């Protein structure tokens, strides 16, 4: 029998012991997701449901590396857990945030990828300046609802905030870290503030991003999950702000390389 708004009260009066009642998934339900072939532990992870329109599975792109998912026709499988014991086990052992670190090499397998990396690079490499409206727009998908003190005033007398300052808003206040970026410059973070350097793959990327790896090991999986979500959102806002495109010439091998 299908339960509808018209017959739900009548069926509620008729329901008896041993009836099996099924329902649709709702926001917050825990399910298991996987992509074949499931070759390692992180090939099968637990996710919380967000019900959306249409008939395709959608997932946060930062979890693509452990699934080896690349959107070229991959088939994903979802399994709805049927009892409380299974749901509890999934929440404790199989949630995505519990799989950030790879058991194979000990570093983070989950982190920023592709356009996220381009976005953080554009945001921090030349340390561009943003107006109050622009800064709030970049941070609107994060927990930050109030800007820090401005970095300066432009020629028109308007306050501005730099890209490194906006990135720093996502870091713990007591984080101290230094390393060399993929771009070859020194990255220095003191008391949760990015002092110098470019944030790229070696900083926040999957498979060994220094910031993600440090947050996971020293601040815990929950704090790392929040950072990964927020840096992905900030990076996408940044790349949309600057614009980013490639052409066929970008695929050509330069003469010196030949």
Name every feature range the model reports, one short phrase each.
Residues 1, 41, 46-258:
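Feature marking long nucleic-acid-engaging regions of large polymerase/nuclease enzymes
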């Amino acid at each position: 029998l299908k339960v509808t708004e018209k017959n739900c009260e009548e069926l509620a009066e008729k329901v008896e012991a041993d009836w099996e009642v099924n329902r649709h998934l709702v926001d917050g339900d825990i399910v298991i997701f996987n992509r074949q072939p499931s070759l390692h532990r992180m090939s099968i992870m637990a996710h919380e449901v967000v019900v959306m329109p249409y008939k395709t599975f959608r997932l946060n792109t930062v979890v693509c590396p452990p699934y080896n998912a690349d959107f070229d026709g991959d088939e994903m499988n979802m399994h709805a857990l049927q009892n409380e014991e299974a749901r509890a086990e999934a929440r404790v052992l199989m949630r995505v945030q519990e799989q950030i670190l790879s058991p194979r090499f000990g570093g983070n397998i989950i982190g920023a990828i592709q356009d996220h990396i381009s976005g953080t690079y554009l945001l921090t490499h030349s340390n561009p300046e943003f107006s109050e409206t622009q800064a709030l727009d970049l941070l609107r998908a994060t927990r930050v609802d109030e800007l820090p003190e401005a970095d300066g005033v432009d020629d028109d007398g308007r306050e501005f905030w730099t890209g490194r300052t906006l990135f720093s808003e996502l870091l713990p206040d007591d984080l101290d870290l230094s390393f060399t970026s993929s771009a070859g410059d020194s990255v220095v973070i003191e008391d949760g503030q990015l002092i110098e350097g470019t944030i790229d793959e070696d900083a926040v990327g999957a498979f060994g991003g220094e910031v993600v790896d440090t947050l996971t090991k020293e601040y815990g999986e929950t704090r790392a999950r929040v950072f990964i979500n927020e840096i992905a959102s900030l990076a996408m806002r940044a790349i949309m702000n600057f614009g980013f495109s490639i052409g066929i010439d970008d695929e050509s091998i330069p003469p010196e390389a030949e």
